[in-house]
Amino acid sequence: MNIAANPTRAPRRAVWMDTDYSITLGTYESGGLVGVFVSTVPGRGGPPVHVHHNEDEAIHVLEGEYEFWLDGQIHPVAAGQSIFLPRGVPHTFRVMGDRPGRNLTILTPGGLEDFFVEAAARDLRMPADMAAV
């Protein structure tokens, strides 16, 4: 496990379903404990409703205003605010307005961040390719 920051290592990048992912800390660097990435999401964009069965997720909004749907309840989250999305709970979000939003995501345990790189490389789409996802 590499516990020191490595400024010479560039973040891994992936663009999947119109969202740009910049993975700044992955499972390799953390020994599987966490995954950290910054996402740039298009205006009015966001993922379909989904569930993480193994990972807890914390999202901090850096730019824009988001609306999160978490287990049937709507939570507005503005720049500078955070939300916790526990594993096993259906959720989604969308960026409010036409301008892109940026958020920092922390997943624990790590590993799911690699999903975005693989999904982008395979050009998988949701919900069309849900069986492959």
Predicted feature descriptions by range:
Residues M1-P11:
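Basic/polar N-terminal segments that are highly enriched at the extreme N-terminus
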Residues P7, E29, A58, E65, ...:
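Short acidic-glycine-tyrosine-enriched beta hairpin
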Residues R13-V49, E55-D56:
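A short glycine-rich, His/Asp/Glu-containing loop-to-beta-strand
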Residues M17, W69-D71:
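Short strand-coil-strand connectors
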Residues E29-G32, V41-G45, A58, E65-E67, ...:
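Short, charged/polar surface micro-motifs in flexible loops or helix N-caps
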Residues A79, R87-E113:
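Ligand-binding loop in jelly-roll beta-barrel domains
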Residues V117-V133:
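Acidic/histidine-enriched, glycine/proline-rich intrinsically disordered or flexible terminal extensions
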